[in-house]
Amino acid sequence: NKSKKRRNRVSFLGVATVEPPKPIPLTWKTEKPVWVNQWPLPKQKLEALHLLANEQLEKGHIEPSFSPWNSPVFVIQKKSGKWRMLTDLRAVNAVNAVIQPMGPLQPGLPSLAMIPKDWPLIIIDLKDCFFTIPLAEQDCEKFAFTIPAINNKEPATRFQWKVLPQGMLNSPTICQTFVGRALQPVREKFSDCYIIHYIDDILCAAETKDKLIDCYTFLQAEVANAGLAIASDKIQTSTPFHYLGMQIENRKIKPPKIEIRKDTLKTLNDFQKLLGDINWIRPTLGIPTYAMSNLFSILRGDSDLNSKRMLTPEATKEIKLVEEKIQSAQINRIDPLATLQLLIFATAHSPTGIIIQNTDLVEWSFLPHSTVKTFTLYLDQMATLIGQTRLRIIKLCGNDPDKIVVPLTKEQVRQAFINSGAWQIGLANFVGIIDNHYPKTKIFQFLKMTTWILPKITRREPLENALTVFTDGSSNGKAAYTGPKERVIKTQYQSAQRAELVAVITVLQDFDQPINIISDSAYVVQATRDVETALIKYSMDDQLNQLFNLLQQTVRKRNFPFYITHIRAHTNLPGPLTKANEQADLLVSSALIKAQELHALTHVNVAGLKNKFDVTWKQAKDIVQHCTQCQVLHLPTQEAGVNPRGLCPNALWQMDVTHVSSFGRLSYIHVTVDTYSHFIWATCQTGESTSHVKKHLLSCFAVMGVPEKIKTDNGPGYCSKAFQKFLSQWKISHTTGIPYNSQGQAIVERTNRTLKTQLVKQKEGGDSKECTTPQMQLNLALYTLNFLNIYRNQTTTSAEQHLTGKKNSPHEGKLIWWKDNKNKTWEIGKVITWGRGFACVSPGENQLPVWIPTRHLKFYNEPIGDAKKSTSAETETPQSSTVDSQDEQNGDVRRTDEVAIHQESRAADLGTTKEADAVSYKISREHKGDTNPREYAACSLDDCINGGKSPYACRSSCS
């Protein structure tokens, strides 16, 4: 025999010796020693540990060690009174840090039902299998341990394992490999025998007793040649056999006779272990999923393993059923010459599968109690079970079942292949027979069946000569339907989908006749279509559970069919369906709801919401304040600095390039802002060279028009000759700011931040799922900033200002005193435009406008027609007393305007310091006589959450 020649050697005395098995080396992720200190042990256990260590030392299983590795060791006492030594290898077993796992070689127990019936058996157990398999020499030091001394009165004794230590991560895999190698010659020589090997337990079956004896004799020799030993006291040769926890008879397989202790079931961990054990033997017991629903329900709730659980009366009955099945259940050993069949039963909750041979039960098959999808159609469950059990049969015997029996007619099977993707997958490549005739036997009669396999009430096509009803729901809790009659239902739900679900349930209850239902909620439509035959997944949301269960009960109680379909809401499509859906929408919608929806989509600011919808300032502020993204991203702003602005649209643009890394290749965002209207346009580019700038400007021209002047920084893309030539072709003048000074581009720099903030809001808190590309995201942000948002000191959007040239400032066109810092004199001028702490002043005819801080302005107190340029007296600052007297004479509010200039100037001063809180004040006194300006302080933030018209408290809420 070649295998014997390979293993045996002849010594010089002529005696055959056994060559020791070659060890399998382990793979380590680190060579850094792992040392876990040994904990103290009681004297009794310490003495037992010394005895066990000496015993292992004599057998050659351990050796003295000076290894830098250490794992704790301890002993436990068996029922027989003997002690057992164990090593705590948890630190060494750390998969992600220390040892490389080998992976399982037998992922699951073998099925004992596949042992041919009436064949004689013999079962053996290998003695101390781990201790007969050596470790690789380089791996021994990793499994060192220490035996401590009491009171440290002497040095501790240290050893290391030379054989597979129990508890090591890869010990079972190595053991299976060694035993598998030893059995391979036996399998090759006795290929007609049925041999099962699991870890160190071996079962042999043969058609005759003589062949079994021959096989066993050869197996003994091969095992001995491999250095393994058979435990003589554990050899089984007669029935009943006990193997892998089961009892084996000549034709039957029975589960172990156990009793479930209910007094120990107190925590989630206790019930988890119990149900794990029951699931392990369910293929033998045949307990359908519906018969364990209450036990599975106990696992719901708190995921803490120590959380308290209580055995309900219903669950107690189910445990009693399990105990009865344990006492009576059995499966059959197969006939190796006959084929297997699969039966699918339409049981309650979910279908049940049974593998049979003729009329003999081989194994039960079940689906999990919990599903992944909220609704799983019963037909889809059947298809999943068929696919799952087909794979199981192939795993058991290597072949597909010969026949599959299902509770469907031939026509229903044909329709299932046409309409159900799950059915097509479950029966893919099946070449056997699909039948609906079940074998006549009593073993299946206890199963509780369901009739809800295929829809009976729900239709997939519109019904003729039936009523048409439109439904709608709103997040304000209103549900409604319209059709032959209208009805509005006030619900407790703050979800539009749940309100719509209530509307559909109400329609199904109110109309006891065939109906067609049209809803604008795709979610509700799909749920209603599937619910009739679906298994509803349990949800922690009790309200949702109640709604879905009520919907299913309502559908199943109906006597007349219905059809439900989806229609898109808020479209401009013509036709009666759109109009009828709008009518249903009007029953539940309001301006507030629409404002909330727009903000969720675009994150428009308060003033923009107030301008677009008929809502109050408080309602608009509440919408923005309840938006998580707008609160997180609403950062304090700083004044933009001294930057001359255009006096009309397209007079002066500022342009810059910013970066958005999430856009990938298109991360270069070219931004242009009109300094008069604040209209913004931006494009995504792959760079910032001159060609990219030109491409961006052409896009700006198409949207904004052509400017007179553009201001940029000193970047190479803006200073190139090609760019200057491009501007000259379009008759555009070009200026640049001071190099390395971002304040020269303060307006566009502020715009960059505003644009990025809007992008983040829409990405992390937006409801739009269609903006997938960078340019689409950018366009949505630009739409919000230009056409929806209204900024402080404005009454119109930037787009309206840019297209119409409409002015916002109430001070424009008024005569003022302005201070000339060069001459230190006060001059008379006229305000051209006003904003952000600065004003553009016209000194006189044929003179260029001047930009000055508003703190250098005072309103002129004489009639406009009498205004003349000052002489010596005019170089003095106008006195407030004059203003007061003129105020009293004319009855106007110019004094207020003067205070406004001082307040805004003061805010502008603060804006230039580190202590500036980015809030400027503007007084807008409503009637003469008010002396408390703080009551009318307005916020200066461009995207003020209070719309710039709130009380003084706005300052803290916006900051």
Curated annotation (Swiss-Prot):
<dbReference type="Pfam" id="PF00078">
    <property type="entry name" value="RVT_1"/>
</dbReference>
<keyword id="KW-0863">Zinc-finger</keyword>
<dbReference type="Pfam" id="PF00075">
    <property type="entry name" value="RNase_H"/>
</dbReference>
<dbReference type="InterPro" id="IPR002156">
    <property type="entry name" value="RNaseH_domain"/>
</dbReference>
<feature type="short sequence motif" description="LPQG">
    <location>
        <begin position="164"/>
        <end position="167"/>
    </location>
</feature>
<feature type="binding site">
    <location>
        <position position="603"/>
    </location>
    <ligand>
        <name>Zn(2+)</name>
    </ligand>
</feature>
<comment type="function">
    <text>Early post-infection, the reverse transcriptase converts the viral RNA genome into double-stranded viral DNA. The RNase H domain of the reverse transcriptase performs two functions. It degrades the RNA template and specifically removes the RNA primer from the RNA/DNA hybrid. Following nuclear import, the integrase catalyzes the insertion of the linear, double-stranded viral DNA into the host cell chromosome. Endogenous Pol proteins may have kept, lost or modified their original function during evolution.</text>
</comment>
<dbReference type="GO" id="GO:0003964">
    <property type="term" value="F:RNA-directed DNA polymerase activity"/>
</dbReference>
<feature type="compositionally biased region" description="Polar residues">
    <location>
        <begin position="872"/>
        <end position="884"/>
    </location>
</feature>
<feature type="binding site">
    <location>
        <position position="500"/>
    </location>
    <ligand>
        <name>Mg(2+) 1</name>
    </ligand>
</feature>
<dbReference type="GO" id="GO:0000731">
    <property type="term" value="P:DNA synthesis involved in DNA repair"/>
</dbReference>
<feature type="binding site">
    <location>
        <position position="472"/>
    </location>
    <ligand>
        <name>Mg(2+) 1</name>
    </ligand>
</feature>
<keyword id="KW-0862">Zinc</keyword>
<dbReference type="InterPro" id="IPR036862">
    <property type="entry name" value="Integrase_C_dom_sf_retrovir"/>
</dbReference>
<keyword id="KW-0808">Transferase</keyword>
<feature type="region of interest" description="Disordered">
    <location>
        <begin position="898"/>
        <end position="917"/>
    </location>
</feature>
<feature type="domain" description="RNase H type-1">
    <location>
        <begin position="463"/>
        <end position="593"/>
    </location>
</feature>
<keyword id="KW-0238">DNA-binding</keyword>
<feature type="region of interest" description="Disordered">
    <location>
        <begin position="867"/>
        <end position="893"/>
    </location>
</feature>
<keyword id="KW-0511">Multifunctional enzyme</keyword>
<dbReference type="GO" id="GO:0004523">
    <property type="term" value="F:RNA-DNA hybrid ribonuclease activity"/>
</dbReference>
<dbReference type="InterPro" id="IPR003308">
    <property type="entry name" value="Integrase_Zn-bd_dom_N"/>
</dbReference>
<dbReference type="Pfam" id="PF00665">
    <property type="entry name" value="rve"/>
</dbReference>
<dbReference type="Pfam" id="PF02022">
    <property type="entry name" value="Integrase_Zn"/>
</dbReference>
<keyword id="KW-0548">Nucleotidyltransferase</keyword>
<dbReference type="InterPro" id="IPR010661">
    <property type="entry name" value="RVT_thumb"/>
</dbReference>
<feature type="binding site">
    <location>
        <position position="627"/>
    </location>
    <ligand>
        <name>Zn(2+)</name>
    </ligand>
</feature>
<feature type="short sequence motif" description="YXDD">
    <location>
        <begin position="198"/>
        <end position="201"/>
    </location>
</feature>
<dbReference type="InterPro" id="IPR017856">
    <property type="entry name" value="Integrase-like_N"/>
</dbReference>
<dbReference type="GO" id="GO:0008270">
    <property type="term" value="F:zinc ion binding"/>
</dbReference>
<dbReference type="Pfam" id="PF06817">
    <property type="entry name" value="RVT_thumb"/>
</dbReference>
<keyword id="KW-0540">Nuclease</keyword>
<dbReference type="GO" id="GO:0003677">
    <property type="term" value="F:DNA binding"/>
</dbReference>
<keyword id="KW-0695">RNA-directed DNA polymerase</keyword>
<feature type="binding site">
    <location>
        <position position="472"/>
    </location>
    <ligand>
        <name>Mg(2+) 2</name>
    </ligand>
</feature>
<keyword id="KW-0378">Hydrolase</keyword>
<keyword id="KW-0895">ERV</keyword>
<comment type="similarity">
    <text>Belongs to the beta type-B retroviral polymerase family. HERV class-II K(HML-2) pol subfamily.</text>
</comment>
<dbReference type="Pfam" id="PF00552">
    <property type="entry name" value="IN_DBD_C"/>
</dbReference>
<dbReference type="GO" id="GO:0006310">
    <property type="term" value="P:DNA recombination"/>
</dbReference>
<dbReference type="InterPro" id="IPR001037">
    <property type="entry name" value="Integrase_C_retrovir"/>
</dbReference>
<feature type="binding site">
    <location>
        <position position="630"/>
    </location>
    <ligand>
        <name>Zn(2+)</name>
    </ligand>
</feature>
